[in-house]
Amino acid sequence: LYKIGPHTFELGLSYASGQNALSIIRSEMRSIVSQVDEVCQMGVLVGQDVHYLLKEEGHAIISIISDVGHHLPAHVTGLGKALLSGLTDDEVRQLYAGYRFFPYTPNSIMDLDTLIAALQDIRSAGIAYESEESTAEICCVAVPLAENGQVKAAISVTTPKFRYTDEKKQQITQLLLKKRQLIEESCRIQNCRLVF
């Protein structure tokens, strides 16, 4: 005879809370897409990779290598760098100890010191930028999503370089910063955990 214990109940509550958080995030991602007509994605950090969990697309055609269920090296994506910014420099050094950096494009980060310097800038600004680091002709803006001061996920907007004007970059930046605040506040008010 088996019975459900308190740990199973807690696991179920955690799953339900994560699903509610995903619903909040997806709603805000749809709002972002409706305003900028570009691809919006959400992901989490798993080891040295960003794993893509949600994706919303606009009407504009864009071909990108990431998709829901896929993963890419975090250090070459805006989404990944936003996630890595939640780690301390020492944690990043430990995570990338012995890592072999691969040049996906000529703009890819190729060493640990450059990555750490980029992450320090992201921590200061609260936003990450990627310009053709994982894919030629593709740019990305991303923000981390935190719970109790710890980065748990990130959302991004990806756009082809030819549409990535200074005005578009500024529009996306302001929108993502606003949506980050809305998502984090909504999750806090609704008691939704950023657990995925």
What are these regions (language model features)?
Residues I189-F196:
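Short, highly charged C-terminal tails/helix-capping segments
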Residues D37, V92, F101, S124-A128, ...:
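Generic structural signal for secondary-structure transition and capping sites
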Residues N107-L182:
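Extended hydrophobic
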Residues R30, R93, Q120, Q181-E184:
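Solvent-exposed, non-membrane alpha-helical residues enriched in polar/charged side chains
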Residues G80, L84, T88, L177-E184, ...:
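Short amphipathic alpha-helical signal-transduction/dimerization elements
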Residues G12-A16, P103, T159, R163, ...:
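Short amphipathic alpha-helical interaction patches enriched in hydrophobic/aromatic residues
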Residues S14, Q35, E167, L182, ...:
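Amphipathic, soluble alpha-helical interaction motifs
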Residues K3-G98:
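Amphipathic alpha-helical effector-binding/dimerization core
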